[in-house]
């Protein structure tokens, strides 16, 4: 395993993995090594630190090595573990979905502050993992919502997240385009429309980090020539 003796401690293996990821130009090397090992061992960060002198289980060496190799090639940690936390909620992610970002939590905060208390139904355009819609439903148990995404794979992920979180009775997801006005009619009427559409100008995609431009879905990043294509489509589709 990694060119080291078979009976390697958890701490030594973490140090070796961190060094490899740093050599690959990954700034978050230490954190990534810890997250991937926690995923393999099924433990949290505190457990790793407290048991650092224990021998890493031999039967898990191949799995951990495989994840480190994939991370060296810049595959995002969230795709490797299949999980990304958003709004303190663990969401399943796959390469069919954009990885939820912490700064997108401001959309949830703003919606909660501005939505009237009597809001009953919301629609999320470009739902991806469903993180925006499901986070809002998590905060307000009287809400119902519909998520729309052009990707069948993303819709499947969002539905699975809703099921895991026990929200499938209040949330439904459909394949569709946010530029079609009928999208806003089916399942409506809606009190609130939420969306975090792609906003990166097409020519700037190549300037993104390899982790993003090589692995995350282009349609969820590419906002067209000026980054505003999706916004124009949505504004035309709104009642």
Predicted features, each with a name:
Residues 1-47, 53:
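Non-catalytic accessory regions of SAM-dependent methyltransferases
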Residues 14, 33-34, 64-65, 77, ...:
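A general structural signal for well-ordered alpha-helical segments in protein cores
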Residues 21, 162, 238:
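Conserved hydrophobic residues forming the short capping helix/wall of the S-adenosyl-L-methionine
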Residues 36, 162, 196, 212, ...:
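Conserved RecA-like P-loop NTPase ATPase core
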Residues 37-113:
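Conserved AdoMet
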Residues 102-207:
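Conserved SAM/SAH cofactor-binding pocket of Class I
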Residues 199-229:
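Mobile active-site "lid"/loop adjacent to the S-adenosyl-L-methionine
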Residues 225-239:
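Conserved Class I SAM-dependent methyltransferase catalytic core
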């Amino acid at each position: 395993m990694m060119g080291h003796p078979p009976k390697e401690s958890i701490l030594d293996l973490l140090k070796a993995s961190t060094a490899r990821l740093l050599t690959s130009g990954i700034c978050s090397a230490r954190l990534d090594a810890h997250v991937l090992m926690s995923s393999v061992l099924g433990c949290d960060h505190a457990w790793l630190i407290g048991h650092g002198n224990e021998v890493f289980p031999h039967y898990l060496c191949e799995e951990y090595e495989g994840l480190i190799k994939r991370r060296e090639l810049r595959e995002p940690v969230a795709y490797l573990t299949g999980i990304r936390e958003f709004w303190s909620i663990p969401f399943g992610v796959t390469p069919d979905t954009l990885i939820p970002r912490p700064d997108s939590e401001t959309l949830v905060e703003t919606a909660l502050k501005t939505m009237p208390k009597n809001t009953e139904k919301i629609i999320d355009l470009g739902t991806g993992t469903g993180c925006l819609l499901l986070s809002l439903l998590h905060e307000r148990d009287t809400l119902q919502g519909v998520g729309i995404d052009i990707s069948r794979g993303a819709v499947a992920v969002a539905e699975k997240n809703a099921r895991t979180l026990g929200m499938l009775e209040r949330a439904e997801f459909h394949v569709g385009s946010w530029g079609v006005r009928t999208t806003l009619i089916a399942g409506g009427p809606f009190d609130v429309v939420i969306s975090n559409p792609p906003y990166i100008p097409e020519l700037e995609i190549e300037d993104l980090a390899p982790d993003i431009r090589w692995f995350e879905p282009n349609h969820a990043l590419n906002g067209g020539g000026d980054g505003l294509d999706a916004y124009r489509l949505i504004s035309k589709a709104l009642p």
